[in-house]
Amino acid sequence: MTYIQERGSTHVYHVNRMSKEEMDHMISLCVHEQPAYCVAACPFKADTKEMLFYAAKGNFKKALAIYEKITPFPMILCNGCTAPCEEKCRLCELGDGISIREVERAIVRYGEPGKRSSVFRIRKKKKAVIFGSGLFPLFLAGELEKKMYPATIYCQEKDYEAYIAAAAPELLESDRKNEVKRLSSMDLSFEFGCSLDLPFIRAKMKEADVVCASEEVAKKLAPEETADAEIMLREQAGIVSGPVRSVMDAAFAAKRAALTVDLLVQNLSPHSNRDSEGAVTTRLYTNMDGMKGSKKIPCSTDGYSKEEAIEEAKRCIQCHCDECMKSCVYLREYKKHPGLLAREIYNNTQIIMGDHQMNKPMNSCSLCGQCTVTCPNGFDMSQVCKSARENMVSTDKMPLAPHEFALMDMLFSNSEAFLCRPQPGYETCRYVFFPGCQAGAIAPDVVTEAYEDLCRRTEGGVALMLGCCGAISEWAGRYEMTEKVNEQLKQELAKLGDPMIIAGCPSCMKQLKESLGAKVTGIWEILKEIGLPGQAKGLEIPVAIHDACGARGDTQTQDTIRELLADMGCTVVNTEYSRDRSPCCGYGGLTAYANKEMADKMTEKCLERSDCPYITYCMACRDRFVREGRESRHILELLYGINAANMPDISEKRYNRLELKEKLLKNIWNEELMMEKKDYTVAYTEDAISMMDERMILKSDVERVLSDYRENQEAIFDEETKELVTRSRLGNVTFWVRFVETEEGYLVRRAYSHRMNIMKRVGQ
């Protein structure tokens, strides 16, 4: 037996197979973090969706805290807001959109203002002055205070209340008092009752690093210059000023002006860092299928009551995109959208020293490609995980443990169990039947019947190739092993005259096409052409079809399978998530080896779609469904009238492959395969067999350990259980066997393994 060398712990190859640019492009396809339609329409980027979420729960304090992030004076802004967000609400497509403005007013009215942070904040050294009153100076004062600028406001008004009244005379008295309280609590310096004549202003300008003013004052200082609408700056005069048109304009201009102040004090261009200002276009996708429209809650002139605001907020559908997560067990289990998960996986590949905590998530993806179909932008999580695995392998940072058993199984299929022969009477053939490694392991009689039928009913000769297509190493990211498999298969195909491959498995079909560039068709296509075998018979009860991951995007295969079932008289029940949207059974991508619990949940998810028996055209799918207790048949079982009806364990699967090879060589090519025979027997308790299958320990591994025991007689005797315990290291794994000796040989009661190496001290 050939073993795979474990990675080196100190030797690192700096060969990245995944670039940051490629990953950034892939991540950009995920729209999960794109702003909701209402949020994107707001020039302040108010998180309206989040506000409505908390308002619907009656948590007006939390909702107000979100609103306070975008403006220092929420009551003034919400009263003057023109609500561009409302027309972008997706509910407008079905009926009435959300009355966002009225809910915001209720949030401001009923919400408890948050306490100012007690965290010590360092004030900036540069000083600012603001001359005049009105909406723009008021909002700008609040924005500069947020940014911790020492700011002095010079105005003609006599006090805070008059200053607020000058800016927002339409406010109700109670609202005005609240905003006065908010303004007076800010860390700002006010000089009331000033005569804002030019000598006074110019004298105060000398005391400041940045000069800001109302439009009225700015015209006095620079009558021939107007402020740039993008940066709110009269550049020649060096005065920051803004418009006097509306509440929305003034508040937005104040935000722009505050950024200008930031840039000026840093000696940077005031035109830089402006890309993210204002309303934006969102790429968010929200599936409205199944949504129902509703009428908005009527609003009186006094606005919503608290209860009415809660009911209106509850109408919000919380626009988001989770199309891929709806059907993908993998993404749901990790509770992360693909963009975030992909970023974490990429970062994991770049770690040189330290723990690679994303190895298990990276290896848990089934690489099925379902997300590419469900995602509106075709985000391919399978490509991310596959590239990450290859990257970890190429940099010698990928542990062998998660995939070693599957890789060893592939090597077994392509060595001891491998067979390649032309049809008797032919040196080269028109076709070669490639049933796939799982078919020979699970239903060897089906392989025999299918091959003999193809030989009888097709012209030009049909060769047979038993082996693995290389998908195992491809999924594991072991690209060098895949190349060796490709080379082996190419050489064998060349001996046969490079025939067309008749694949019995859609994953094999896909792998052989992509890796070898070979001519490949499915056995189902051949049978559709030459007709059903005589023994073909469908089930008498309705059945559900599970489409294999390897057939995703292959409409021809999907249609042919359904046509064959119809020809056999099967009644097919349509299920959710079928054809290209079909989920993975849990075997693909080696999930069943790297994360058994995840794979089991994937299988359960597949079976939730219907209570009917499942018809598959992938033997691995059929095997996993049977193991979950669901009646399942591979379509070839129906076509050839064979019900394998078995659930072979991992050791039986290997034995089935060897036995299939032996029988075919003997019955078709008249060749005898000499099987090794022992002069003793090894028996197993049922608990031992179950345990070994669960822990992926082969009977051949146990027998190798017992063979070593026969040579060295090294074992520990357990006085309590009267069992012998022996061990042996095979490749990268140390196997332990608990057994008793019998007259015929040995009875194995338990077996377990680990990856530690037991060192024996000699002479001590």
Feature-to-residue mapping (PLM):
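Short glycine-/small-residue-rich Rossmann-like dinucleotide-binding loops
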Residues: E215-V217, P376, P506, M619
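Iron-sulfur-cluster electron-transfer modules
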Residues: A36-V39, K49-D209, K335-K519, R657-K666
